[in-house]
């Protein structure tokens, strides 16, 4: 019986150790990039709501252009982080996000809300995919990065 408990405890220790090795705290630059992206995404949602409620009224594309500029810088930081970590899936999603940001920027400059909406929707889906695959919430409510 005692031998069985030792084996079970040993297996549990190995599982916990392996799980912990697959996560790490993100760098300050990465954390700032994610926070900047969250703020920009929030600005896009607010601007979209205002845009849709204005009907044929004054339609402001400036918030979309500003958000795209912020996200371009943030996703460049994100891409660099994932390239350094050699996590191909996250690299691909970061590159995809940058393409959606370029489409968002183009739609805003062309003053074409349909393009802005398509790009921001695709960007949200890409962000969600990356978060599901490469982020884990810790017991204290913070996030860590899944490296493996």
Listing of model-derived features with the role each one plays in the protein:
Residues 7-16:
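Bacterial N-terminal signal peptides
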Residues 20-124, 139-148:
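Extracytoplasmic c-type cytochrome modules immediately beyond a signal peptide or single-pass transmembrane anchor
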Residues 123-134:
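The canonical Cys-X-X-Cys-His
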Residues 1-4:
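Positively charged n-region of N-terminal signal peptides that target proteins for export
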